[in-house]
């Protein structure tokens, strides 16, 4: 099934690249990038099945190692291929007598995209090797498994489809929202408002390449926690343990908020210094996007997790329905802000944030209804919020005092380190995390002993 779906998706991506980039997204220069990325669609489809198999067997090790291999190969190939193909593109322009041509940028971007495809292929190769090594054990376990009834492939496929399709649709709506936003934004700016094309491209490049890239880092942690929450909730649901389901839900939400709330405050306070640290602060718009939209980290983290919770309690269709409602509503808001309010890329950020807020509201209502769940407020939201506010004010004042003396990069790194320390100190001081929860962390017992010595717990 994964082979068929992956091959179909890969073919659609490759042969439809011109239509997607030129007609839908109004960025014909990215056609080559999308064609190079087509291989990754097939590879990821197969790799997802193998990762899911090992996770279902109760081990995350093959998945974790394959992800490390994938990212290492991705980084190496992206840098090398981008450099080589950029030079190749420049030579093509020179040979054609074109000055200030786009071939260098087009081929360089395609080289960078090649890293994604080959990184995924390297991760898949590792998983295939592990699967071949494990096959002997699997065959032995299958021979020992005496069952009274053998399920047919048709019934198994039917269950898989009924489980997979709602998850895919929910994820697809999330991803489609970005594509739709791009198409609508460029249509409004270029065709309706007749804005300068290079300016519009700069706006969108800052939004995707800087704002969304940095805000997606803590959101990715929420996605990982969401994926790990689903099996535990499913086991509790099958055993009929509603108290355990509510306990797992509360713990997962608290953990995500412990990460996402300080991340949002940190990006608000240090967004511009972080951009300077990465040498990305080349336009005054970028820092403003973080001032306006860093709160999206909180709402996207929570909405991603609540999607997983609803899937874990076998309410697969609800996240899909909620995502469609949020997509349509946020699109109407974005059109109003960009076209009527003339807010250009700021309108996109506000609508992007509204999408996640609405998802949180709709998913939260569904969880309350189907799980009889009542959210704890103090330790989940108030204490992380107060601790994050103190941390953000402290590091902002510190940065303002230091950056003219010791330089932007050193002062930013120092503030980032101190931000973690200050936040952790106040969370512990305000009893935002219990000793039992600390003990569940890696090296948790050592951490508890150390904190007891300084009387923080």
Identify the meaning behind each predicted range:
Residues 397-457:
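Membrane-proximal transmembrane or re-entrant/amphipathic helices at the cytosolic face
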């Amino acid at each position: 099934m994964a082979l068929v779906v992956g091959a179909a998706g890969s073919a659609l991506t490759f042969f439809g690249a011109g239509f997607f980039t030129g007609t839908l997204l109004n960025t014909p220069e990215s056609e080559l990038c999308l064609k190079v990325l087509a291989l990754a669609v097939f590879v990821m489809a197969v790799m997802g099945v193998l990762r899911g198999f090992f996770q279902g067997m109760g081990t995350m090790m093959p998945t974790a190692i394959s992800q490390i291999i994938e990212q290492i190969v991705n980084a190496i190939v992206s840098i090398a291929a981008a450099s080589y193909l950029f030079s190749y593109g420049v030579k093509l322009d020179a040979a054609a007598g074109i000055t200030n041509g786009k071939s260098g940028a087009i081929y360089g971007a395609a080289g960078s995209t090649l890293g994604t495809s080959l990184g995924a292929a390297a991760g898949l190769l590792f998983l295939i090797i592990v699967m071949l090594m494990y096959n002997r054990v699997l065959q032995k376990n299958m021979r020992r498994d005496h069952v009274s009834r053998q399920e047919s492939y048709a019934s198994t496929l039917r269950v898989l489809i009924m489980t997979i399709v709602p998850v895919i649709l929910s994820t697809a709506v999330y991803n489609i929202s970005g594509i739709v936003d791009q198409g609508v934004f460029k249509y409004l700016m270029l065709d309706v408002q007749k804005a300068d094309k290079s300016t519009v491209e700069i706006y969108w490049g800052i939004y995707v390449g800087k704002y969304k890239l940095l805000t997606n880092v803590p959101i990715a942690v929420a996605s990982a926690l969401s994926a790990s929450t689903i099996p535990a909730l499913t086991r509790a649901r099958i055993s009929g343990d509603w108290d355990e389901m509510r306990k797992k839900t509360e713990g997962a939400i608290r953990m995500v908020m412990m990460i996402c709330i300080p991340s949002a405050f940190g990006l608000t306070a240090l967004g511009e210094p972080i951009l300077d640290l990465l040498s990305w602060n080349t336009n005054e718009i970028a820092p403003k996007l973080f001032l306006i939209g860093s709160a999206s980290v909180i709402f996207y983290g929570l909405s991603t997790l609540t999607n997983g919770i609803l899937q874990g309690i076998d309410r697969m269709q609800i996240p899909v329905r909620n995502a469609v409602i949020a997509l349509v509503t946020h699109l109407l808001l974005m059109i109003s802000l960009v076209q009527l309010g003339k807010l250009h890329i700021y309108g996109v950020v506000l609508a992007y944030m509204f999408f996640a807020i609405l998802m949180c509201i709709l998913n939260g209502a569904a969880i309350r209804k189907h799980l009889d769940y009542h959210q704890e407020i103090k330790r989940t939201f108030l204490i992380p919020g107060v601790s994050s506010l103190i941390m953000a004010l402290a590091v902002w004042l510190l940065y303002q005092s230091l950056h003219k003396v010791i330089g932007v990069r050193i002062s930013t790194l120092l503030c980032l380190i101190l931000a973690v320390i200050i936040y952790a100190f106040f969370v512990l001081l305000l009893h935002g995390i219990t000793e039992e929860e600390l003990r569940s962390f890696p090296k948790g017992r050592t951490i508890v002993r150390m904190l007891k010595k300084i009387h923080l717990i």
